[in-house]
A protein has these predicted regions:
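Sec-dependent signal peptide recognition
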Residues: 2-9
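N-terminal signal peptide c-region/cleavage motif recognized by signal peptidases
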Residues: 16-18
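Surface-exposed, glycine- and small/polar-enriched segments that build interaction surfaces at terminal
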Residues: 21-187
């Protein structure tokens, strides 16, 4: 047993620098997975032009004239001059972009012209919010989700409202009316 524990400790000690070797503090990303310096993880600042892709960003991710794509982001996505962000698995933090496209779990705030999300524990604030899962709070001209706790806008639509909808037209499959002006809430 002692030899096994020693072997596991040695393997972990050897593997840990290799795991960190692919992380860089600063990166430039563009088309065809071109990353300078080469790597798949950023722990600092990344600038993405046109369409940059990496597995993970922990820090600030700037997108310029195109889309920044990651699997996981912890920090801030910031779209500059028609920049947007796409997170495939998990976003923790704030996305401030022309469009925010988060396919997995989001914890934080999405602020943009268009938000396309899955599950959001936080706030979606944009002209158009579209979510295939649960949203805690949506504020916008139009908000459409599968399930929501709170929606505020001109048009709000969800299959299941847990809290309240406030707007010109509010539709919820479980609402006290399927569609109702000004306010709607669960039966």
């Amino acid at each position: 047993m002692k030899k096994l524990m020693t072997s596991v400790a040695m393997a972990a000690a050897i593997a840990s620098p290799m795991a960190l070797a692919d992380t860089t503090p600063v990166m430039f990303s563009t088309l065809d997975h071109t990353n300078a310096p080469a790597g798949d993880s950023v722990g600092g600042v990344r600038l993405s032009v046109l369409h940059g892709q990496v597995a993970e960003v922990k820090g600030v991710d700037f997108s310029l004239l195109g889309m920044s794509e990651t699997d996981r982001t912890t920090g801030v996505n910031f779209g500059l001059f028609f920049g947007g962000s796409k997170v495939n698995q998990e976003m923790k933090g704030v996305s401030l972009s022309l469009f925010n496209w988060n396919e997995g779990q989001t914890t934080g705030v999405n602020l943009g012209a268009v938000n396309v999300t899955n599950n959001v524990e936080g706030l979606n604030w944009s002209a158009v919010n579209y979510s295939q899962g649960y949203t805690m709070a949506d504020i916008g001209l139009a908000s459409i989700s599968k399930k929501s706790n709170f929606q505020l806008g001109f048009f709000n639509k969800t299959e299941q409202i847990d809290g309240v909808q406030i707007g010109l037209l509010n539709c919820a499959d479980n609402g006290f009316f399927p569609c109702f002006p000004i306010i709607n809430f669960a039966k």
